[in-house]
Amino acid sequence: MFVRIRDYNENLRAVRFCRRPKDSAKLRILAKDNIGVQDFLTSAGSYALRDLVLPDAFCVRQIRKNPQIDIFGKTHLTELAGFVTTRVLKDGYSELGGFGRNPHGAQYPCRGSSSGSAIACAAGFCDAALGTETRGSLMMPAMANGVFGFKPTRGAVSRSGIIPLSSSFDAPGVLSRSLSGLKTVFSAMLGKDDSDPQSFVPSELRKKKFNGRTLLFLVSSGDYAALNTPAVRRFISALKQGGFHIEFRHAPMAEFDYKIIS
């Protein structure tokens, strides 16, 4: 992997820093450069933050408890995880990293903001990579670069030690070329963090009783067809079996304004 990074990273612009991965590690992973990793600087792609030193984020500390996983570097990203500019820029661009490139071909977009993490996974630079999502920042680059991406429920993974974009929407997650790698890294990230008010342990929810509680789903005009898919029907059935009362209401599409969420 280190050799692949050396040979191809200058063209793909995925990795900001790295060292040789540990030989003993079974999963060699990279972290998006808005996530604190004490071994490397953390910039969120911003020239203004180029020399910022952060301690390990909570999720990184949790991962380090698993000796089979080695965090050996940082990936480039869309600057500040979402452009703060009056200019229209390409997904995956940052002042420090330049323009990321999809390894499947320059004619394909890399998307963002976890662009470097997705590119690195697709190019074989790592087994998995950490990313963050505020509005599609994990899922869109995963789809564009042909890798698996997982955005957990907000609070399932602590946000402590991560440069924020929107406290209402930010969620750390994982990208990987394999589902097994994704599952292993995600499981290692879990843990209750008292410094993050949204933090919870997913397994503890199974112990709670939800009888009589109502879950309201807001559905836009273009999403009604999805309600009849087998996967969604199974999901709704499981919620009802868990004691929830389910309601659906129409929600008109809101005018897009990225500033609202940040």
Please provide the spans of the model-predicted regions:
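Non-transmembrane alpha-helical segments in soluble domains
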Residues: 2, 6, 60-64, 118, ...
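Short, well-ordered beta-strand segments
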Residues: 28-30, 72, 214-218
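Flexible, acidic loop-helix segments that line cofactor/substrate-binding pockets
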Residues: 202, 213, 249-262
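Short, well-ordered alpha-helical
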Residues: 1-52, 57, 76-83, 206-208
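Acyltransferase
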Residues: 227-252
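A short helix-breaking turn/cap at a secondary-structure junction
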Residues: 14, 151-235
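Amphipathic alpha-helical segments in well-structured domains
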Residues: 56, 147, 232-236
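Short glycine/serine-rich loop segments
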Residues: 65-189
